[in-house]
Amino acid sequence: MRKNAIAYDQLYALLRPAVWHKAVLEVATGTGQVAKHLLCSADHIEATDASAAMISQAKRGNFSSKLYFSVQDMFHLPYADQSIDVVIVCNALHIVPHPEKALIEFRRVLKNDGTLIAPTFTHAENSPWGNLQALALKIAGFPLHSRWTSAAYLAFLQQNGWTVCKSVVLQNSIP
């Protein structure tokens, strides 16, 4: 798991400048770890998840007025058009059906000069270890709806109207 901790520390270091003094929406926050790690950099973070249980867990230990957790559907966000500086969706687009529809909703809430940050695990290499982990995710209730290589994921984003300004592959124990 040390490999995961290193990868996430690298991810946080990459994200902090992008959220500096910004209004941030994190979608699919899960336990809220990304939002909590970025709290000191952002002006305000709205961290959402479709699971009430995940939001309940994420709220534990949150004493900041700059961080608000709520249950939301990433396909129907309650935020005004062009009201968010940065949308973050970490490791989630591969587990939702029709991720392109989520991208449309993210574009709606982002300001014209806003930034989408969408790191995800790439599972398409089909290694035995990757396939085993994909099966474990499915059993845990997170079936993979999309299996991308890094290049295919970037192409998916571009095909859906996004300009990729930066792409970094971080080594993690989850492929």
Where are these regions (language model features)?
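Conserved alpha-helix/loop element of class I SAM-dependent methyltransferases that forms part
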Residues: K3-K22
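Class I SAM-dependent methyltransferase SAM/SAH-binding core
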Residues: L25, T31-H76
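A conserved beta-strand element that flanks and buttresses the S-adenosyl-L-methionine
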Residues: I88
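Short catalytic micro-motifs in class I SAM-dependent methyltransferases
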Residues: N91-A92
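A short glycine-rich, Lys/Arg-flanked "PGG" loop and its adjoining helix->strand segment in the class I
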Residues: E100-N112
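Conserved class I S-adenosyl-L-methionine
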Residues: I117-A140
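Short alpha-helix
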Residues: H145-N160
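Conserved S-adenosyl-L-methionine
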Residues: W162-N172
